[in-house]
């Protein structure tokens, strides 16, 4: 039997459901999610393998007009995937009209010479007539290889989209072992799970001002627990105070919620220590960006 494989980028504006889609396909969380725009900062690889195929999905940061060096990194990281994939899933929301951000992405896709499948997500939120109008609007902007409406949250039509990708794969190698689901190390996934809880529990500028660094991660032979020390980086003293909370209550809640997800991922009991440090204006300093895992080697 012929084995098929290929690389697929998931592109779109912030908050259109790219990570929700990837997690649904993979059957577990490998990309963090929140209702905050620009939740995904790094390219996240999800490796979907069956006995006949391997589809390597690359979930990218939401493409937006950057205001910081971190924003520049995120947008360039997203566009760089166009150089390394066989197919692009361009995801748009069914419940929002096409905007300037979509048009900007479409112009880049036209120049990329890569087959593009339009994925219209969040179909559970709109009337069928609105969905058809949305599809017609995008169809007039460029030639798509396929147009597939889905609900990533509810799973509607997701398996059909995977089947379409499979049908269009070429014969190829199995690039990764069958049991590997991502290329990111455990430390990265741990840091993302802590950051996800900060996103869920804070508001305004704080979610965008936070980075998480895992300082150490090792098993304690006496307790048989994985001991993790993680530092939450912020840009201002006022942000540090909010994340710590009254009597340390907020930091404790962040740690408790993150620990549960980390234990599920690792399949081990975890002892998680979290600290908060101030690093002023880190989002505009390339050395700090590199230290916190946002470096140009990604693209």
UniProtKB/Swiss-Prot annotation:
Residues 59-62 are annotated as: G3. It comes from Streptococcus pneumoniae (strain JJA). An essential GTPase that binds both GDP and GTP, with rapid nucleotide exchange. Plays a role in 16S rRNA processing and 30S ribosomal subunit biogenesis and possibly also in cell cycle regulation and energy metabolism. Residues 150-152 are annotated as: G5. Residues 4-171 form the Era-type G domain. This is GTPase Era. GTP binds at residues 12-19, 59-63, 121-124. It is a peripheral membrane protein. Pfam families: KH_2, MMR_HSR1. Belongs to the TRAFAC class TrmE-Era-EngA-EngB-Septin-like GTPase superfamily. Era GTPase family. GO terms for molecular function: GTP binding; GTPase activity; ribosomal small subunit binding; small ribosomal subunit rRNA binding. Monomer. Residues 121-124 are annotated as: G4. Residues 12-19 are annotated as: G1. It is found in: Cytoplasm; Cell membrane. One of its GO terms (biological process) is ribosomal small subunit assembly. Residues 202-280 form the KH type-2 domain. Residues 38-42 are annotated as: G2. GO terms for cellular component: cytosol; plasma membrane. Keywords: Cell membrane, Cytoplasm, GTP-binding, Membrane, Nucleotide-binding, Ribosome biogenesis, RNA-binding, rRNA-binding.
